[in-house]
From Swiss-Prot:
Topology class, membrane: Peripheral membrane protein
Subcellular location: Cell inner membrane
Name this polypeptide is given: Putative membrane protein insertion efficiency factor
Domain of life according to the entry: Bacteria
Region annotation Disordered: where it falls in the sequence: 62-85
Length: 85
């Protein structure tokens, strides 16, 4: 995990430690939104991981869907094309 991703993971870890036991475990998805956020930060880094986490949290509401929603695997970046010949 990048240093910035570690910093962005701190509020998620604090939520899991402090607030989650009080509000209950009511996430509509598997993995939970906080687990999804931590995994997204781990796999994708700070920018893309936080974007994926924000999108997921935005989908988690009573009128939204539910079920299994894993973090997508990172796409391999292709090297730039070199001129032929």
């Amino acid at each position: 995990m990048t240093p910035l991703a570690h910093i962005l993971a701190l509020p998620v870890r604090a939520y899991r430690l402090i607030f989650s036991p009080w509000v209950g475990f009511n996430c509509r998805y598997q993995p939970t939104c906080s687990a999804y956020a931590l995994e997204a930060l781990e796999k994708h880094g700070a920018l893309r991981g936080s974007w994926l986490a924000a999108r997921r949290i935005g989908r988690c509401h009573p009128l939204g869907s539910d079920g299994y929603d894993p973090v997508p695997e990172p796409k391999d970046r292709k090297p730039p094309h070199s001129p032929a010949g």
